[in-house]
Amino acid sequence: MNAKVFNPSIITKEQIAGLHFPSQEVLVLPNEIKQRRKNAQEGLLLGNRYKAKVRIVFEDTETLKQVEATIWGLTDLHVILKKGTTIPMHRIYTIDICP
């Protein structure tokens, strides 16, 4: 599935806690996975320094979703948003800096 072809549902970060995530990786190509990690790290730096928000497109068990939030932390497996809300890294299609 190419996330850029579909229109994701826009949600708030508070809604993420009630979502369920499958264990399958959404990206296929190794370079896409590497770029996602790089974008997450850039988002973390901008979030910590300037409180800049990113647009994250991800997929839970139901549909493609989009949230705009500040990245507060990263682990190998998760992107951490404000108030400890997490999104599994393997379910994220794109992370872009908000204009």
Predicted segment positions?
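Short, Lys/Arg-rich amphipathic alpha-helical interaction segments
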Residues: 72, 76-99
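Short glycine-rich, low-complexity segments
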Residues: 1-63, 95-99
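Short coil-to-beta-strand transition motifs
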Residues: 60-67, 85-88
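Short, compositionally biased strand/turn segments
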Residues: 49-50, 63-76
